Amino acid sequence: MPIFTPPSPALQKAWWKETIVYQIYPRSFKDSNDDGIGDLNGITEKLDYLHGLGIETLWLNPIFASPNADNGYDISDYRQIMPDFGTMEDFDRLLKETHARGMRLLLDLVLNHTSDQHPWFREARTSRENPYYDYYLWWPEEQGHPPYRKSHFDEEGDAWCYNAPTRSYYLHYFARQQPDLNWQNPEVRAEIYDILRFWLDKGVDGFRLDSIPYIAKDTSFPEIDLCKYPDVFPYYSLGPHLHDYLHEMNREVFSRYDCTTVGEGSKTSPEEGWKFIAPERQELDMLYHFGAADIRNETEADDPATGIPYSLLALKRMYAEWDAAVGDGWPTIYLGNHDQPRMVSRFGSDTPEWRDLSAKMLTMFLLTMRGTPYWLAGDELGMANIRFTRIEEYDDIDTRNHYRKLLREGRDTEQFLREQQEIGRDNARTPYQWDGSRYAGFSVAKPWLRVNPDHTEVN
């Protein structure tokens, strides 16, 4: 009798291996109420268009209540919808209509930090004795100034912010309005698992988990020795118990639902990346690494994102290394997102002569690799970088804070603005170009971010 050998995990079918994920930046997709801001009802209006494209899964950037210091990545209430985007009833309708077309919906959740306006932090910052104090990471003033850590978005560059009522510094690896959660506290993890269940019980099909390697830190905060350890990333993330936390989250939540998970793993190496998605480890399904975003030109010393062409050889080698490293895990394939330049500008050519061919070539690349392909809304049109010329045109907190820092230090802001034309995050966040009308069919009101002037030709 022949012996049946089950297929390897990499060959086992799963809906999230056979789908195309289409990323929607809700603020920029479609405005349904004429206030210049995209919203949930605008997405619902365009579901037939997306279904006609062959899109099977939507990923929405954060839609939760937020003061918008970082466009929704500073969440003040995980169970409420941001008023700019609509109501919970609007979300329920969007979810129902998405499922009615045989499509699925993923939500973008930020679990490394909250807004400083979240009720947890508003309580935590009042007193060391407050039970919510241990929901966050602090350094008491009696121990002196904490060891240096760099903030990604803070204008001063320091990831520690002093809080007088508690006589201590709180940690924020991103903006000071985004205090980092203390995942070592089991009460924090229990709260997060309840949030995940809330949305899964509503029927969402999974999550993209923002900055997931950052949830675990070495909270002794050793001094960074750049001579001994030039790669500083392990000082910030990939800390003790990271994979214990992810396994626990899978066991307590994800394994009980028909859902998928993809973690954002910036700066994660292929050797580390497989740990997140190896089927036998039961953590996440996919990892959204930044290999393509970090590609360098092997013949130039400068950063390729400032206009120097990338190395095709390096791009091919990077994807080959990741494919080999993840083994039976399942990779992701993407060339752009809301934090990166437009893919046709970064990896192809956005000149009139080559834009169309570049967009088609890059899309073919995404669809022919092993792994789940991710598109950013507008990639199918060949939407390109907008190339703002004045700082006032930018909305992004990272760009604006960096500019102020350079201005204060008397450094070259004109060169910085030229670089932002190539690498700035707002390049990917301009309103979707539905048609050639004044505001590209996105809205009848002035949009929150300027429409790319090429929308009369590219729509």
Where are these regions (language model features)?
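Active-site and adjacent substrate-binding regions of carbohydrate-active enzymes
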Residues: 1-459
